[in-house]
A protein has these predicted regions:
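Bacterial N-terminal Sec-type targeting sequences
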Residues: 1-126, 130-139
Length: 139
C-alpha cells in the first residue's frame, strides 16, 4: 500500500477494529443490562422495605427480586454454554416470557445449525418453547 504496509496488515487491522467493535457491543450490552437490573432491584427493595406497604405489595416485590436473581443466573448459564459451543462471545436477555441471545458472528451470518444449537441450550435452561426465543448475530 502507499504507506508501506502490506495488504495483509491492512486486513488484520480492519479485523482487529471489527473485533473491537463487537467486543465493545457485548461489554456495553452487559453493562446496560446490569445497570437496568440494579435500578429495578433498588426500587423493588425500597418497595419491599416500605413499612406503609401492604403485605401483597411486599410479597410481589420480593417475588420480582427473586425472579431477577433467577434471570441473572439463567443468563450467565446460557452465555457460558453458548460460548462452550465455540462462539467467541454472546449476551442473553431473559425475561418472564422470552429470551433473546446475541451471538458474536463470523461475518458469514447465522446458519440454521447455529440457531438450532443456541435454541436447544435456551430451551433446556428456561423451559421456553422455540417461538419464545430470538437468536441474532451482532454485526
Amino acid at each position: 500500500t502507499a504507506d508501506g504496509s502490506s495488504l495483509e496488515e491492512d486486513a488484520s487491522g480492519e479485523d482487529q477494529e471489527a473485533f473491537g467493535a463487537k467486543k465493545n457491543y457485548f461489554d456495553t450490552a452487559r453493562l446496560n443490562r446490569q445497570e437496568s437490573r440494579d435500578s429495578a432491584l433498588s426500587l423493588l427493595k425500597e418497595a419491599a422495605a416500605d413499612e406503609k406497604a401492604d403485605q401483597a405489595a411486599i410479597d410481589e416485590a420480593n417475588r420480582e427480586i427473586q425472579q431477577i436473581a433467577q434471570n441473572t443466573t439463567t443468563e450467565a448459564t446460557i452465555e457460558n454454554l453458548v460460548m462452550a459451543k465455540g462462539y467467541s462471545d454472546c449476551v442473553a436477555f431473559v425475561n418472564k416470557e422470552s429470551v433473546s441471545v446475541v451471538i458474536a458472528g463470523t461475518g458469514e451470518g447465522l446458519q440454521n445449525s447455529d440457531i438450532a444449537k443456541v435454541t436447544d441450550i435456551v430451551m433446556e435452561e428456561t423451559g421456553l418453547t422455540a417461538d419464545k426465543i430470538k437468536i441474532m448475530e451482532a454485526n
